From Swiss-Prot:
Function of the molecule: Catalyzes the hydrolysis of UDP-3-O-myristoyl-N-acetylglucosamine to form UDP-3-O-myristoylglucosamine and acetate, the committed step in lipid A biosynthesis.
Protein name listed in UniProt: UDP-3-O-acyl-N-acetylglucosamine deacetylase
UniProt KW keywords: Hydrolase, Lipid A biosynthesis, Lipid biosynthesis, Lipid metabolism, Metal-binding, Zinc
A Pfam family the protein falls into: LpxC
Record gene name: lpxC
UniProt family annotation: Belongs to the LpxC family.
Amino acid sequence: MIKQRTLKRIVQATGVGLHTGKKVTLTMRPAPANTGVIYRRTDLNPPVDFPADAKSVRDTMLCTCLVNEHDVRISTVEHLNAALAGLGIDNIIIEVDAPEIPIMDGSASPFVFLLLDAGIEELNTSKKFLRIKETVRVEEGDKWAEMTPYNGFSLDFTIDFNHPAIDSSTQRYCLDFSAEAFVRQISRARTFGFMRDIEYLQSKGLCLGGSFDCAIVVDDYRVLNEDGLRFEDEFVRHKMLDAIGDLFMCGYNIIGAFTAFKSGHALNNKLLQAVLAQESAWELTTFEDEAEMPLAFRAPSTVMA
């Protein structure tokens, strides 16, 4: 039986909020089988829970938010959600003493490190996967994203940025997903933005935590970060990281192929909601025999250790 996963122990870290620029304490706790992914704001009295759910997602200019029926929100969940998807963690309570998850270095890598430091525990309950049975596609202008049936999880992402720092040969990235591939090839890719946009937002009291420490910053001609890029195609790898986190908002690892052109958080979520709304397009499945499970979801010892 392929089992659900949670953490072995509580793990805690501090970081800076992208919006407020203030210190945020992040605490991640193990959770019982079938709990799902729960984000919790402990700065509110009483604390407010936000279950990861496709219909609760709101896209903003700066990040992805989860919003409840009272219009209370928790922001900047996307990179941590990608780390959970990458490691296949089904059940977890994520607490912050602020209205946002800390931005850390702008990638998912610090969250991967914390989750692996906590250790991954298998629970004695079957893990559910969402298997794509029919092609579903969404479009907005020249942007599009689609899911198709595939016995694994593959991603094919293309961006289209006309910028001297983003070479045309580095605007497409393909990945046959596994936990190991995610950690090594995707998790370290950072978010990016224009210096002029960051300066404008900060003049309006927004994006106060934005800096060279948590993003790739570009001007009209070049990358401004002293250390440059982590990958020559870091921009498109980060967009794929975002998509992995966005698609995991359904609460299950997906068995299917994701292809996108110029997609972002809003379109990724629109695709996920379109899939879920078309009941014939998907099914939940479990695996009693590990040999039947797609290779994509077999946790390598290098990641699970």
